[in-house]
Amino acid sequence: MAVGAVSQIHVSVSDLEASVRFYRDVLGVPFLFEVPGQPMAFFQSGPVRLYLGVPEPPEFASKVTLYFATSDIFAERERLAGEGVAFLDEPHVVNRDAGGELWMTFFRDPDGHHLALTQTRPAG
């Protein structure tokens, strides 16, 4: 088993409103949604989701985060943990909508870059 394709990329921004205008209105990247009460905006660039966010708490702060799609987030997390990967959190739901629930769990590569596993699961 291996992680799937990159499904999402996170870019830290200093001004979310200005960045949304730039990516949506100047570059024309299709806007998906903002998270109410959170400094986050999401776009769809072909098969890859782009996540713009104002820096988070220190343990999650990173200039870039790669998100890897997986068909079973729990099994893949267990496999990677068996390979010595230390996770920063447990798999958890980050968004619910008509398409289902978006689950994530975060870890780091050897240089400290943030990586995540993602899975869209049926709502329920």
Q: What spans do the regions from the language model cover?
A:
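N-terminal beta-strand motif that seeds the catalytic metal site of vicinal oxygen chelate
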Residues: 1-18, 64-66, 118-124
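Core segments of cupin and vicinal oxygen chelate
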Residues: 4, 10-50
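Vicinal oxygen chelate
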Residues: 16, 66-114
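Conserved catalytic-core motifs of GNAT/GCN5-like acyltransferases
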Residues: 30-35, 92-95, 120-122
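Short acidic/glycine-enriched loop/turn segments that link adjacent beta-strands
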Residues: 36-39, 60-61, 98-101
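Conserved beta-strand in the GNAT
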Residues: 50-53, 115-118
